Amino acid sequence: MYAETVEGTPQGAGISPLLANIFLHYALDLWVRQWMRRAATGQMRLARYADDFLLTFERRADADRMATALAERLAKFGLRLHEDKTRLIEFGRFAATNRRRRSEGRPETFDFLGFTHYCGKTLDGRFMVHRKTQRGRLIRKLKELRQELKRRMHMRLREQHGWLARVLRGHYAYYGVTGNSYGLRRFLTQAVRAWHGAIRRRGQKRRMSWDRFNALLRANPLPPPRLAHVWRGRAA
């Protein structure tokens, strides 16, 4: 069934993020800049990618007033904030001290662009925003990887190895940030186990033991985890 429409963007189409960017540049970006100059009493920042965005404030009062103003702004375009994805949290250099004084436990975390962001420190004790692979993203990507390995199960091992190596390099290129070494190693470990499982399933007479598989990896090593985005302040 097909029906023409002049509203919205094609779901899943490559042009949809571009159209969303153009629309939100006017509906959100420019408006936030104007609000910041006109109404903010402290520092604030906007970070946006497509329709995911993050607003940071120096002062809680600004955040509260922006929450009201933003809802009104989006309503003019027939939009509203996603209730499950919209939160106002205390985060930053003084969050841990403030929450400890109020007996509220550790600072909350937030997810943005595939990372879970949380308050941490550098090796010399300075505040630093730490990032780790978002748990849901990791689970989903590993599931997709296992499904693709199953589909490629009967390809030559050399072709499987080449494909998996490219997947790992792409993962490191995006998620290889300071403080996320554990997340990279975990992805590699699970990817290796998934590949071994796929090879074992295709062997009818002689299954691939771990000894044979480890010998295969020594002869054809997979790319090791590497950080692609390193900040000067080393994570603790």
Where on the chain are the PLM-derived regions?
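Non-catalytic terminal/accessory segments
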Residues: M1-A236
